[in-house]
């Protein structure tokens, strides 16, 4: 049987544990579980050097080893006879393997605890089918994913074209991000996804669109370098993990820290939406000419949702979506400036919002906390940073003048908002603010009137106040 490493690409996803067998110089064998075997090239694989000190000592004495890997599509096990070649502590291979380990640890809140010491590269001397089903030998009940009726996202040209056609029909950032996530579900079968963009605060990403989650994630933040999303942004490389829950078992077992009450500054954050027990995660950096436009995150409760053959298509998809988002942001900024230059609303031309029935209108207590630059509505956190400053400016202007219509241009000209001079992403901030209000405080609405023009609509009375 002529079997190549390329034909076993699906075995190197880490879905089912592999087994590593080594032997000391005096003939004492040792067996250890491996979470992941990494494909290097047509003749080599790499094993992570982390915890298996006995295996490492044996290899130093006797460079021959045997590893058993399962095929997650068929359940067939394969024996790879190996010869140790070298250890790498830097370079693309080491970085790729270290990033996967760090992503799983960071997902558990244990970033920095699990470190890859080296990527040990082995030459594959022979490949033989295993007589024993490897999934049974490691105590894992195996369910093949192909041919079982489970959906598999195949990145065909037709699916990519369908998504591109959907994107071409959008005319705003809001419709674009919604079309992207809807297309990922309808064309590729990805039901749970979100898009994050860089926030005003350095080192932070903020969620502007989600799909498939019961909780509204608009405004949810991820710090760069933390969690899978943050690591994707930091490394600017895709992270694709299969069998995530199994990979997290060890990390959870090591986590004995107490869950102390969080300080107020941390409570004033919106948690990222997510599946309670994700089995697969995919994070894709959205890059344009070296600039991070955002991060696309996709989750699944299927252990083997993202396949090896999809890797190139995933990279291509990320580049296309990044260009689409950046072009839409530039398009909205330029067109709103040209439209707004024709007419800027005057105070006299715009009346305050009135309600046809004021008998049952509630009063909302809206408090702006200056130190944290955040807004609380009826003692519940709403939003912070630039979107909070924008909303506070709109509410105070309405309170003082009765105005309820505004333009993007006047916000850009308002120095008190402290918008960046270059690429302020104002449209993304307004989208975030609008969706956050829809979820947490529907009595306050920001309604688009025309490109670059919007209205503040109130279904409540406001009691505005500030806190240091």
Q: Where in this protein do the model-derived segments appear?
A:
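Short boundary/linker motifs that mark transitions into or out of structured domains
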Residues: 336-388, 392, 444-447, 451-455, ...
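DNA-recognition element of transcription regulators
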Residues: 383-391, 419-440
């Amino acid at each position: 049987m002529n079997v190549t490493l390329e034909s076993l690409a699906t075995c190197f996803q880490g879905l089912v544990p592999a087994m590593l067998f080594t032997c000391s110089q005096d003939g004492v064998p040792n067996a250890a579980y491996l979470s992941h075997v990494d494909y290097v090239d047509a003749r080599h694989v790499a094993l992570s050097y982390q915890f298996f000190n006995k295996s490492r000592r044996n290899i130093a004495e006797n460079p021959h080893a045997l590893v058993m890997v399962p095929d997650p599509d068929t359940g067939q096990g394969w024996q790879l006879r190996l010869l140790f070649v070298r250890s790498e502590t830097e370079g693309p291979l080491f970085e790729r393997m270290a990033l996967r380990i760090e992503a799983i640890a960071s997902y558990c809140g244990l970033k920095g605890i699990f470190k890859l010491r080296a990527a040990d590269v082995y030459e594959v001397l022979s490949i033989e089918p295993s007589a024993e089903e490897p999934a049974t030998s490691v105590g894992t009940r195996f369910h093949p994913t192909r041919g079982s009726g489970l959906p598999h996202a195949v990145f065909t040209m037709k699916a990519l074209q369908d998504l591109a056609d959907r994107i071409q029909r959008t005319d705003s950032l809001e419709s674009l991000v919604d079309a992207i996530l809807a297309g990922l579900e309808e064309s590729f079968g990805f039901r749970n996804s979100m898009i994050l963009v860089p926030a005003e605060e350095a080192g932070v990403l903020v969620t502007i669109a989600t799909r498939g989650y019961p909780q509204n994630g608009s405004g949810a933040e991820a710090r760069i370098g933390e969690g899978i999303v943050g690591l994707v942004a930091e490394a600017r490389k895709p992270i694709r993990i299969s069998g995530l829950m199994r990979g997290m078992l060890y990390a959870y077992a090591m986590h004995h820290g107490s869950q102390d009450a969080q300080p107020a500054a941390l409570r004033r954050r919106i948690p990222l939406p997510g599946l309670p027990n994700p089995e697969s995660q995919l994070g894709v950096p959205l890059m344009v000419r070296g600039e991070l436009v955002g991060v696309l995150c996709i989750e699944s409760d299927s252990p083997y949702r993202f396949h090896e053959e999809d890797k190139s298509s995933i990279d291509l998809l990320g580049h296309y979506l990044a260009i689409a988002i950046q072009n839409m942001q530039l398009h909205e900024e330029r067109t709103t400036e040209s439209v707004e230059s024709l007419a800027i609303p005057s105070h006299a031309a715009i009346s305050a919002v009135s309600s046809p029935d004021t008998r049952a209108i509630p009063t909302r207590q809206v408090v702006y906390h200056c130190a944290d630059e955040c807004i609380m509505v009826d003692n519940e956190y709403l939003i912070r940073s630039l979107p909070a400053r924008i909303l506070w400016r709109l509410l105070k202007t309405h309170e003082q003048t009765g105005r309820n219509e505004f333009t993007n241009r006047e916000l850009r000209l308002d120095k008190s908002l402290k918008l960046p001079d270059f690429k302020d992403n104002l449209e993304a901030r307004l989208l975030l603010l609008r969706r956050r209000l829809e979820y947490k405080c529907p009595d306050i609405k920001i309604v688009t009137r025309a490109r670059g023009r919007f209205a503040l609509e109130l279904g409540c009375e406001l009691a505005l106040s500030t806190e240091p």
